């Protein structure tokens, strides 16, 4: 893809650079451009990217499908964090579905036609941003649940969480509008098709704008939000010293560190590519190195589909009990249908948290605080 969020096509050797990908380098001197060949970059990408995309697809699909099945089967009355986690799993799955298309496109060329070019690119961008936004929503939920459990508890209703989830999808859809409008197939050379955006005579401006948008909405603002929310949560945990405080602090730190490690290298590379296109610095050799870096760091960033759901889901004792119930049901069914139901019932009963249960993590502290302030919907249901 071009300057949208979609995976970047490999560099080519012609000088038609203004409307093409991040991998092109816009030289003022056309002679210098022609001397900057990127055959090695293209060869590397044709091997590395399809293999890495396939690995991410298999691992991410397995983990997110498991998460989705557990949430749908065992969490009929979902709290805010579980609604966000469910949407995160859906977002990741839709994101992962696009990777085989890009892998085939890199290894060969775009063979899926113009309609799928536009649709896959749009689907990619929507779920690229929605996945990051839902992670931020989960951080906000934990912040309200632990730091402001009493005064802001009315903000943490299922209706409001569904509303916020709808807003996230709407914003992500709006961000993908350039894909809907500009992305199309291009034949170059004859018989070889590529799928990327064509911005007409305003290619450079659009590329700079969309990269800035990606750095800001896709990394900087979510990172600052997570640092603020989890630092405040950490202060509360240190002050209250609940059981399991150490584990909860480690979970909070792990979530922030994981987001930074996965996304910072990619966003830094995008920023350096922007400076390169503006000719603030660089030459052909620098351009080649950044092309390699962009392929590698982009692939590392895509690992968030595999790691983020695991980190968030397994930070909750409640979810671990749900997972045990699910695995007991599946394994028990293959071993003995009669024992499967007993195992499922036993695990399901153990998944109910009580006031006497030990707090083992950050999510469990929030659950305990939530029990002290039942939300308005639950009170209405009980009174009815």
Swiss-Prot record:
Sequence segments annotated as region (Disordered): 363-384
Biased composition (Basic and acidic residues): 365-384
Annotated S-S bridges: 117-195
Regions that span the bilayer: 51-71, 93-113, 119-140, 163-183, 218-238, 251-271, 294-314
Glycan-carrying positions: 19
CDD domains named among the record's database cross-references: 7tmA_ACKR2_D6 (cd15188)
PTM annotation, UniProt: Phosphorylated on serine residues in the C-terminal cytoplasmic tail.
Keyword presence, RNA-binding: no
GO cellular component, one term: nucleoplasm
Pfam families: 7tm_1 (PF00001)
InterPro entries per the UniProt record, alphabetical: CCR1-9-like, Chemokine_rcpt, CXCR4/ACKR2, GPCR_Rhodpsn, GPCR_Rhodpsn_7TM
Region (C-terminal cytoplasmic tail): 327-384
Keywords: Cell membrane, Disulfide bond, Endosome, G-protein coupled receptor, Glycoprotein, Inflammatory response, Membrane, Phosphoprotein, Receptor, Transducer, Transmembrane, Transmembrane helix
Keyword Phosphoprotein annotated: yes
GO biological process: calcium-mediated signaling; cell chemotaxis; immune response; inflammatory response; intracellular signal transduction; positive regulation of cytosolic calcium ion concentration
Record membrane topology: Multi-pass membrane protein
Tissue specificity field: Found in endothelial cells lining afferent lymphatics in dermis and lymph nodes. Also found in lymph nodes subcapsular and medullary sinuses, tonsillar lymphatic sinuses and lymphatics in mucosa and submucosa of small and large intestine and appendix. Also found in some malignant vascular tumors. Expressed at high levels in Kaposi sarcoma-related pathologies. Expressed on apoptotic neutrophils (at protein level). Expressed primarily in placenta and fetal liver, and found at very low levels in the lung and lymph node.
Subcellular location: Early endosome; Recycling endosome; Cell membrane
Function: Atypical chemokine receptor that controls chemokine levels and localization via high-affinity chemokine binding that is uncoupled from classic ligand-driven signal transduction cascades, resulting instead in chemokine sequestration, degradation, or transcytosis. Also known as interceptor (internalizing receptor) or chemokine-scavenging receptor or chemokine decoy receptor. Acts as a receptor for chemokines including CCL2, CCL3, CCL3L1, CCL4, CCL5, CCL7, CCL8, CCL11, CCL13, CCL17, CCL22, CCL23, CCL24, SCYA2/MCP-1, SCY3/MIP-1-alpha, SCYA5/RANTES and SCYA7/MCP-3.
Domain notes: The C-terminal cytoplasmic tail controls its phosphorylation, stability, intracellular trafficking itinerary, and chemokine scavenging properties.
Family: Belongs to the G-protein coupled receptor 1 family. Atypical chemokine receptor subfamily.
Protein name: Atypical chemokine receptor 2
Species this chain originates from: Homo sapiens (Human)
């Amino acid at each position: 893809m071009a300057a949208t969020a979609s995976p970047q096509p490999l560099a080519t050797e012609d000088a038609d650079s203004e409307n093409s990908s991040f991998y092109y380098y816009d030289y003022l001197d056309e002679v210098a451009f022609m001397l900057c060949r990127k055959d090695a970059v293209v060869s590397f990408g044709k091997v590395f990217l399809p293999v890495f995309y396939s690995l991410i697809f298999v691992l991410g699909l397995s983990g997110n499908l498991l998460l989705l099945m557990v949430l749908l089967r065992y969490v009929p009355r979902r709290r805010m964090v579980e609604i966000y986690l469910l949407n995160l799993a859906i977002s990741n799955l839709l994101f992962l579905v696009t990777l085989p298309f890009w892998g085939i496109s890199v290894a060969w060329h775009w063979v899926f036609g113009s309609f799928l070019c536009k649709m896959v690119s749009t689907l990619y961008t929507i779920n690229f941003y929605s996945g990051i936004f839902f992670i931020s929503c989960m951080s906000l939920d934990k912040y309200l649940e632990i730091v402001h459990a009493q005064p802001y508890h009315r903000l943490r209703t299922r209706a409001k969480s569904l509303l916020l989830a709808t807003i996230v999808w709407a914003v992500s859809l709006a961000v993908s509008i350039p894909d809907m409008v500009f992305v199309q197939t291009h034949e170059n050379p004859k018989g070889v098709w590529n799928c990327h955006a064509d911005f007409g005579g305003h290619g450079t401006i659009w590329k700079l704008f969309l990269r800035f948008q990606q750095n800001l909405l896709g990394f900087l603002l979510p990172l600052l939000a997570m640092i603020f929310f989890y630092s405040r949560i950490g202060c509360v945990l240190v002050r209250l010293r609940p059981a399991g405080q150490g584990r909860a602090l480690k979970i909070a730190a792990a979530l922030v560190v994981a987001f930074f490690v996965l996304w910072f290298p990619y966003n830094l590379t995008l920023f350096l590519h922007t400076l390169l296109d503006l000719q603030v610095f660089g030459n052909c050799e620098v351009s080649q190195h950044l092309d390699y870096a962009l392929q590698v760091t982009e692939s590392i960033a895509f690992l968030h589909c595999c790691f983020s759901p695991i980190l968030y889901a397994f930070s909750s004792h409640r979810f671990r009990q749900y997972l045990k119930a699910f695995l007991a049901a599946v394994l028990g069914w293959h071993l003995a249908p009669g024992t499967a139901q007993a195992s499922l019932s036993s695990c399901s009963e153990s998944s109910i948290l009580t006031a006497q249960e030990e707090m083992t993590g950050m999510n469990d502290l929030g659950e305990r605080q939530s029990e002290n302030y039942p939300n308005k919907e639950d009170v209405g249901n009980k009174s009815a």
